[in-house]
């Protein structure tokens, strides 16, 4: 059915038979020849991925759509050489199209006009993707247009081929500039990153340097404050030292008097010391038998040194009654020794006897006269700080070693005879404990902060060095040792003199005290032979009142020393007290005592040492009990580590039980009024003579 808007159908012209039909149109002209373009260098040729992307773009422009890159619709000619691919398409009715051209194997002369019309940069550019489309001229109405794409941009250009009047469209895409731009941007980023890292490192170094500088500044400030405290502590110690020297002087004088009545005391003390006997030969032993006293004194000025004095009786070796060896510090701080020349009798010089005795060079008096030995300072320090402080423990060491050898022989005899031996006396028990404490003295380490020898002056020069001061607790341990607790006599008040001491014998023999000191030399042998007479052993006014009373005084002063030192343990004495104080070495002490700060600093010390003998007796008794309890625990711990026979252990248990009961019974009988005159020190090892017997 015809539509209403359409007109009548047009009449077609009929051809008569007389009219001949028109001739076939002429054959189409041959297709334009292939364009030969110069290939880019190899380094600028596109890669496979770029080639695929360019083909995809061309396909989109032709309207093929997304998907893999496809060639243009046929008929087309593909020219591919050196990584460059060109598509040539012609219209289906284009004149001059040839099957050889369609298949891509035809050859024709290149159109020079088209090549000349193209600009050189677009023809010989870098990585190119070229698409040629050739259509019929009638479809575009005459002239064709040429459009190119380059790095500059899209711009239409008209290329008129006067012969074929065909239109060619060339699309050029270049990606080299993008790659170079990306490389340049990556280099810029790396440079910025390196600059930032260098800047961070430089800032961190600056911060660390500033932090270290602030730390060092704080440390320097603390050190300055510490030096100021050390100066004050040195001044306080100086005053405290003078007080203690005055307190100890009577005890030292009393000790010297007692030692003079003991023949061969110093030679035994020297020989029993673990380090000094290397300098003593047999000839020195004979000379030391005439030694009556040994004194160690500090020099007058602060930090100048000290000297040792040896007092001798008349002897056949030399004429000196006193020989002195002095150690003085020079400007460099080194100790330089000087000694008095020894006036030897004819033929007694060590040099004259050197040919006959090879050990003459290892002599105490050779060391005394020689000032170039490297070990001279060390030996002098041992004598000053160890031997002279407590010579009694080294004097009693030989007895302990002899009893130890007897015990070993007794053990061998027991194992040989295979019989049980019952010890009837308690002397081995006493000597065992004595030997323990003698061994402890070998391993005692001297504390180099405070030395007792600095407080044990015998001269009137009280200015001292504060480079080394021994811990005063060492003296307390010495006074609490079993050698000192051998006698359980109750001493009178310290204000009474040694000759007026009235002692009460805890062994029930107050009337049996001997007034002759020579009879007391037999007490040790009587103790071994007659165990029943142990209660009459140590009853002598001389040793009990003078010697042991002095140890009681030493104990009192040691307690006060301990209390005073506990308050100043943390103080640091550098040994440069005199230099920091700015005091002159002329013996004047005004610089040390004139400031009010010093009085405030040592207020505690003066309160402690104002009158140590007038303190409350109840408080003093508590201190004594605490010290004695600690000493008992220490002794018990040491005794447990020694290998002894089972019988000896059994005896120790029996003795300890009975001895403690007797001591505490006596403590209960004493009244408060008696505490002023008598101080009980409960110690299970104090008096082995009061212990029971085993049998």
Swiss-Prot record:
Subcellular location(s) per record: Nucleus; Cytoplasm
Entry's induction text: By TGFB1 and all-trans retinoic acid in lung cells (at protein level).
Keyword terms of this UniProt record: Cell cycle, Chromatin regulator, Cytoplasm, Isopeptide bond, Nucleus, Phosphoprotein, Transcription, Transcription regulation, Ubl conjugation
Biased composition (Low complexity): 539-557
Record PTM Phosphoserine, positions in chain: 18, 20, 670, 673
Domain of life: Eukaryota
Keyword Cytoplasm recorded: yes
Tissues/organs with expression: Ubiquitously expressed, with highest levels in testis, adrenal gland, cerebral cortex, ovary, skeletal muscle and spleen. Present in testis, adrenal gland, cerebral cortex and ovary (at protein level).
Functional summary from the UniProt entry: Part of the CASK/TBR1/TSPYL2 transcriptional complex which modulates gene expression in response to neuronal synaptic activity, probably by facilitating nucleosome assembly. May inhibit cell proliferation by inducing p53-dependent CDKN1A expression.
Protein's recorded name: Testis-specific Y-encoded-like protein 2
Organism: Macaca fascicularis (Crab-eating macaque)
């Amino acid at each position: 059915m015809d539509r209403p808007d359409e007109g009548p159908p047009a009449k077609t012209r009929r051809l008569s038979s007389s009219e001949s039909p028109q001739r076939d149109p002429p054959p189409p002209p041959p297709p334009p020849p292939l364009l030969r373009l110069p290939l880019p260098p190899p380094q600028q040729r596109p890669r496979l991925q770029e080639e695929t992307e360019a083909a995809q773009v061309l396909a989109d422009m032709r309207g093929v759509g997304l998907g893999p890159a496809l060639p243009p619709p046929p008929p087309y000619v593909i020219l591919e050489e050196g990584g460059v691919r060109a598509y040539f398409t012609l219209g289906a009715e284009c004149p001059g199209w040839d099957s050889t051209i369609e298949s891509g194997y035809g050859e024709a002369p290149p159109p020079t006009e088209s090549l000349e019309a193209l600009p050189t940069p677009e023809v010989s550019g870098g990585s190119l993707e070229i698409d040629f489309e050739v259509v019929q001229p009638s479809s575009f109405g005459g002239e064709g247009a040429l459009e190119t794409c380059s790095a500059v941009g899209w711009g239409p250009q008209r290329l008129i081929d006067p012969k074929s009047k065909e239109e060619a469209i060339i699309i050029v895409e270049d990606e080299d500039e993008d790659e170079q731009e990306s490389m340049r941007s990556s280099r810029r980023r790396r440079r910025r990153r390196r600059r930032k890292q260098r800047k961070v490192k430089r800032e961190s170094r600056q911060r660390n340097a500033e932090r270290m500088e602030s730390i060092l500044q704080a440390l320097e400030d603390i050190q300055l404050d510490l030096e100021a405290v050390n100066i004050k502590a040195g001044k306080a110690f100086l005053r405290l030292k003078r007080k203690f020297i005055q307190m100890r002087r009577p005890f030292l004088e009393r000790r010297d008097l007692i030692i003079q009545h003991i023949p061969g005391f110093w030679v035994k003390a020297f020989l029993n010391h673990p380090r000094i006997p290397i300098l003593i030969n047999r000839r020195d032993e004979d000379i030391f038998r005439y030694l009556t006293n040994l004194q160690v004194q500090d020099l007058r000025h602060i930090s100048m040194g000290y000297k040792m004095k040896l007092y001798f009786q008349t002897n056949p070796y030399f004429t000196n009654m006193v020989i002195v060896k002095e150690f003085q510090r020079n400007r460099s701080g080194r100790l330089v020794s000087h000694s008095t020349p020894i006036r030897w009798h004819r033929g007694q010089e060590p040099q004259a006897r050197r040919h006959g005795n090879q050990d003459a060079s290892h002599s105490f008096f050779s060391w005394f006269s020689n000032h170039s030995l490297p070990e001279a300072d060390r030996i002098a320090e041992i004598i000053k700080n160890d031997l002279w402080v407590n010579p009694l423990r080294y004097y009693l060491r030989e007895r302990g070693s002899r009893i130890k050898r007897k015990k070993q022989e007794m053990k061998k005899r027991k194992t040989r005879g295979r019989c049980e031996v019952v010890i009837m006396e308690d002397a081995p028990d006493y000597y065992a404990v004595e030997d323990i404490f003698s061994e402890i003295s070998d391993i005692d380490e001297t504390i180099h902060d405070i030395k007792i020898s600095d407080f044990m002056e015998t001269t009137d020069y009280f200015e001292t060095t504060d480079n080394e001061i021994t811990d005063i607790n060492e003296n307390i341990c010495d006074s609490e040792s079993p050698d000192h607790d051998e006698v359980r006599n109750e001493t009178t008040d310290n204000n009474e003199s040694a000759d007026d001491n009235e002692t009460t014998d805890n062994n029930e023999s107050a009337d049996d005290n001997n007034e002759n000191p020579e009879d007391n030399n037999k007490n040790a042998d009587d103790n071994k032979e007659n165990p029943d007479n142990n209660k009459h052993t140590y009853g002598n006014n001389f040793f009990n009142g003078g010697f042991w009373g002095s140890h009681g005084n030493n104990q009192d002063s040691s307690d006060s020393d301990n209390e005073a030192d506990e308050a100043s343990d943390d103080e640091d004495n550098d040994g440069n007290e005199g230099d920091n104080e700015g005091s002159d070495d002329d013996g004047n002490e005004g610089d040390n005592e004139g400031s009010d700060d010093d009085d405030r600093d040592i207020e505690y010390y003066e309160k402690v040492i104002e009158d140590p003998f007038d303190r409350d007796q109840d408080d003093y008794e508590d201190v004594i009990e605490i010290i004695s309890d600690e000493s008992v625990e220490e002794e018990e711990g040491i005794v447990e580590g020694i290998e002894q026979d089972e019988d000896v252990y059994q005896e120790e248990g029996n003795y300890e039980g009975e001895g403690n009961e007797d001591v505490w019974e006596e403590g209960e009988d004493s009244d408060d009024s008696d505490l002023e005159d008598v101080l009980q020190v409960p110690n299970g090892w104090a008096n082995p003579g009061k212990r029971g017997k085993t049998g």
